[in-house]
Design a protein with these regions (language model features):
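Active-site beta-strand/loop signature of hydrolases that rely on acidic residues for catalysis
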Residues: 9, 31-61, 81-82, 147, ...
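Beta-strand-turn-beta hairpins that frame and shape the catalytic cleft
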Residues: 2-9, 132-141, 164
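Alpha-helix N-cap and loop-to-helix initiation/capping positions
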Residues: 22, 26, 58-65
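Active-site catalytic loop in hydrolytic enzyme cores
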Residues: 88-160, 173-181, 185
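CN hydrolase (nitrilase-like) catalytic-core segments centered on the catalytic cysteine
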Residues: 63-82, 149-194
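Short polar catalytic/cofactor-binding loops
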Residues: 13-18
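A short, N-terminal amphipathic alpha-helix
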Residues: 25-41, 67-80
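Short, acidic/polar
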Residues: 22-33, 148-155
Length: 194
């Protein structure tokens, strides 16, 4: 990315509810609002489809089915969607983030550091690698929520070529000041956009 490149990014703040279908429709509504302000990229929260409501986990469909409405809108409109999702693969469930562009899932990251205080490892399988994704808007690395607390993860993404680090999260509102400091620290330490 050069200093003259401009990218409009919309952070879709959404209250995650116990109803999976309502969450997906709300996410779609927020994407449509991002289109109104001519966003290039819209970022949905961590596990935006299910939240951490365990009763939702059993009904999670394969990604292409779970995210069919998002795939469709990204195909029709010129917008990249980065969404935190509960992803099912066989019997395993992952806390993942996907990059959707032009009707396709063009990148997928599975959370490697599961949050111990909420027993994520009891429900989700950990991912096994960091990745940087080449996109029309630059090289994007992804972490998910709790992983912002590990500076070495951001550093590794930058060493792998990341110019932007996206961190979908479901971070508690009560600690939002803490969240902002963590994001600023990762940006300053690595001299990249977070």
């Amino acid at each position: 990315l050069s200093i003259s490149d401009k990218i409009r990014v919309t952070l879709a703040q959404q209250r995650i509810l116990p109803d999976r279908e309502v969450n997906i429709m709300k996410g779609l509504s927020l994407i449509k609002r991002a289109l109104q302000v001519k966003a290039n990229i819209v970022i949905l929260p961590e596990v935006f489809n299910t939240g951490f409501y365990r009763h939702n986990y059993e009904s999670v469909e394969p990604l292409e089915d779970e995210l069919s409405l998002l795939l469709k809108i990204s195909e029709q409109k010129d917008i990249m969607i980065i969404a935190g999702v509960a992803e099912r693969e066989g019997d395993d469930l992952y806390n993942s983030a996907v990059i959707i562009y032009r009707g396709e899932i063009t990148g997928k990251y599975r959370k490697t550091h599961l949050f111990p205080l909420t027993d994520e490892k009891k429900y989700f399988k950990a991912g096994d690698r960091l990745e940087v994704f080449e996109t029309p808007f630059g090289r994007i690395g992804i972490l998910i929520c709790y992983e912002v607390r590990f500076p070495e993860l951001s550093r590794k993404l930058v060493k792998m070529g990341a110019e932007i680090i996206v961190i979908p999260a479901e971070f508690p509102k009560e600690r939002i000041d803490h969240w902002r400091v963590l994001l600023q620290a990762r940006a300053i330490e690595n001299q990249v956009y977070v």
